[in-house]
Amino acid sequence: MKAEVIKLDASSAGSIELDDAIFGLEPRADILHRVVRWQRAKAQAGTHSVLGKSDVSYSTKKIYRQKGTGGARHGSKKAPIFRHGGVYKGPTPRSHAHDLNKKFRALGLKHALSSKATTGNLIVIEDIAMSEAKTALLAKAVKELGWKRVLVIDGADINENFAKAARNLEGIDVLPSIGANVYDILKRDTLVITKAGVEALEARLK
């Protein structure tokens, strides 16, 4: 498929041929869902922790004798039914990550790129080189281009001036091609890829 290439000043820079096997697939929500779920589970801290019966600070002494009191049978005050007692089967620190095949993850990235291309939310830009790291200059360019919530993917290395200028702009994320992932692509309304980024992604996903 063919895509128009623009410059940062919104002028035309010709066109580029995009690989249909990467940018021209029919997006499948089930594949995207599985990959996003894998990403978010992997990112989850899993530091949740509560005190169990063996962790709370109480004596293990039996609170009163077994028989003859007319009350229910009890052991120590660490039991979950008592105030300040331990929590029964509460959450403990653990990893929430689960396995997902490497080929399936690559397929998910292809479907994420295709979803932006098929909905007209993919923009190919010649490069994002800036002579100086000025947020005001980039903000003006972004306004003229009509970008609201965008993810910009560059080649192997991000242009340092652009990255610094974009740091203070709300709604703009910048990633190198190796950092391109399904969750960040779907999170933003528009995907902007440099020509170097397109080449790097096509080489990565061949």
From Swiss-Prot:
* Pfam families the record matches: Ribosomal_L4
Indicate the family of this protein.
Belongs to the universal ribosomal protein uL4 family.
Assembly and oligomerization: Part of the 50S ribosomal subunit.
Query: What does it do?
Result: One of the primary rRNA binding proteins, this protein initially binds near the 5'-end of the 23S rRNA. It is important during the early stages of 50S assembly. It makes multiple contacts with different domains of the 23S rRNA in the assembled 50S subunit and ribosome. Forms part of the polypeptide exit tunnel.
Note whether Ribosomal protein occurs among the keywords.
yes
A GO BP term here is: translation
Quote the Gene3D superfamilies the UniProt record gives. 3.40.1370.10
Q: Tell me the domain of life.
A: Bacteria
Q: Is Nucleus included in the keywords of this UniProt record? A: no
Q: What is this protein called?
A: Large ribosomal subunit protein uL4
Cellular component GO terms held in the UniProt record = ribonucleoprotein complex; ribosome
For this UniProt record, the keywords arranged alphabetically read as follows: Ribonucleoprotein, Ribosomal protein, RNA-binding, rRNA-binding
Q: Name one GO molecular function term.
A: rRNA binding
